[in-house]
Amino acid sequence: MNITSEELLKEARALEPQLQQWRRTLHRHPEVGFDLPHTKELVKKALTEMGYEPKDCSKAGVIALAGGKKPGKTILLRADMDALPIHEDSGEEFSSEVPGKMHGCGHDMHTAMLLGAAKLLKAHEDELEGTVKLEFQPAEEIFQGSPDMIAGGLLEDPHVDAAVMFHVLAGMPLPVGTVLVPGSGITMASCEQYHIVVKGKGGHGSTPENCIDPITAAAHIHIALQEINSRELKPGDFGVLTTGRFEAGAASNVIPDVAQMWGTIRTTDPENKTGELIRTRMTEIAQGVAAAFRCTAEVSFADYCPCMVVDKPLAENAMDYMTELLGKGAMDMTALTGGKPGGGSEDFAFVSHEVPTVSMFIAAGGPEQGCCYGQHHPKVRFDDSILYEGSAAFGWFALRWLHDNADIAF
């Protein structure tokens, strides 16, 4: 390996106009879930122009290979591509042109960063002591993209020995471009969706005595569920139960037949026993409270995503490599978290349960840059001046890790 970290960072900085163009084009045209035709077209076109042969993977993923000219390990670099089903109100001049859809989590940033890394790695392909697999993933927001691509052969042909992801952070008072490197072990919570359907008997709002009101029952269920955390979990056990959507009826003078609520369960229990307890008690409480109000309740669960597990040697590598590249711009994340897992979830966790993995974060703007809101808010903004650092970080990690592990048998 001949290139230095300073040289790679300089090359990445020269890509800034292209990185910004990719990111802002994606931002204007957000797509959600697995339905990403225009996003995939941009990614595949860019990769092809660089000299890659991109391939489809499963429902909507894209993969490409760099290196392979020298024997060695294979490292996976991943970017997610999907947006959120929310209406943008950021005020950016390149805001979403698609009503009800927005890149509010920064996946447009990730995609542009990995495309930049692809360009850097192609320029230094002869120096790669192994293979880099580039993964552009759909459907992260619904926790289905990663398991779908794994089922489609993501981690084989060639077999992946290590995996890396970066995620941008907005709205945090950190120096722009700071890379946060986590400790090892569980760093992010598991997540599971729930859906509760409460059925009663509808009728005119003036005659509640002739009805069985599902809204009243559902409201009491929502309140009762909050007692699970305080009364049923052991002190120190992490569990979050949040109802984020509640729907019932369509008119102010009509008691509906049905009320529904949707939400998430998050835990940091690797065996998910805490999650099992919460699910069991949710079902019992919902059905019991509903019965008290002469209603019935159906409770279902879906889209489970496990905890993120960070490999200790990779986390140590990450701190070393990011310090080489960015100096004081690399920060030990445990200084902020106290070593405790975060409550957010990420479907790259599925990969972390299959191969050694590290997930890092990049500060992409705080209040000083006008980025006052966090992810998933309609007003969130991201400072795309950090894109080149993200590309360099992806590229430098791959170059260094393959070099360091060229002669190591796993």
List each language-model region with its residue ranges.
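Metal-dependent amide/peptide-bond hydrolase catalytic core
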Residues: A219-F410
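Structural motif
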Residues: K73-L76, V132-K133, V160-V164, A330-M331, ...
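Non-cysteine beta-strand/loop elements that form the S-adenosyl-L-methionine
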Residues: L76-R78, H87, Y194-I196, S359-A364
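Divalent metal-coordination and catalytic microenvironments
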Residues: L26, L77, H107, L134, ...
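Electropositive phosphate-/nucleotide-binding environments in soluble metabolic enzymes
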Residues: N2, E6-L9, R13-Q20, G33, ...
